[in-house]
Regions:
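Glycine-rich, basic loop-to-helix element that forms the pyrophosphate-binding segment
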Residues: 12-27
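C-terminal catalytic/acceptor-binding lobe
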Residues: 105-193
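Residue-level recognition of beta-strand->loop/alpha-helix junctions
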Residues: 10-12, 65, 126
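Short aromatic/hydrophobic "clamp" motif used to bind/position activated sugar donors
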Residues: 33
Length: 193
């Protein structure tokens, strides 16, 4: 984030993702909380600033569109925590929903379910391109299209996914280098729709 001159608070904790998100939100003392996972690269400073502003102006949240393909109905599009900005007022209005995985929800999906049930509008960035299929096969984004390893959302953020695999980690290092050296390109990527 230094490349974009953005001040970031990094944390290192060996806890489940949803538990960590609950911990962060439970201690938030600012108007907007932003989460950027370590395998996600904003492609510009402006997308971060725009997302902060959008969450503030809407008194809601914004995130990358995702579907939990392993949890029925495998069609619910929600704002994933990979790139996620939420107003703390909105979070409190919703009754502080947990980010933990639940029967119907993957990590952070319950937040979107709660917003939908309460009639709170939120925004998602949809995938535009991706580099390759995951080992288990391509991921469907409900009826919208597809995403996979190295997905670009809204032409503005790059999310690697599955960084635990060495080949993906090498790809991520390359993409970080591309962004820092102003040569990131989606040439050779597959369209999501």
């Amino acid at each position: 984030m230094q490349h974009f001159n953005l001040n970031v608070q990094y944390t290192e904790a060996n806890v489940p993702h949803g538990e960590w998100l609950d911990w962060v939100m439970g201690r938030a003392q600012c108007k907007i909380v932003g989460i950027i996972e370590p395998d996600l690269i904003p492609l510009s400073r402006q997308i971060v600033l725009n997302s902060i502003n959008l969450a503030y102006q809407m008194n809601s949240f914004v995130g990358c569109a995702q579907v939990s393909n392993h949890i029925p109905p495998a069609a619910h599009i929600f704002a994933s925590p990979a790139f996620f900005f939420i107003s703390t007022d909105c979070y409190q209005r919703m009754g502080k929903p947990s980010f933990l995985e639940m029967g119907r929800a993957d990590v952070a999906e319950e937040v979107s379910y709660r917003a939908e049930e309460m009639g709170i509008h939120y925004r998602t960035l949809f995938p535009t391109h991706f580099e390759r299929e995951p080992l288990e096969g391509i991921w469907r984004l409900s009826s919208y299209g597809y995403y996979g390893i190295g997905t670009v959302f809204g032409n503005q953020v790059y999310h690697l996914f599955q960084s635990r695999y060495d080949t993906n980690a090498d790809l991520f290092i390359q993409r970080c280098d591309d962004v820092v050296n102003n040569r990131f390109s989606m040439e050779g990527f597959r369209p999501s729709i």
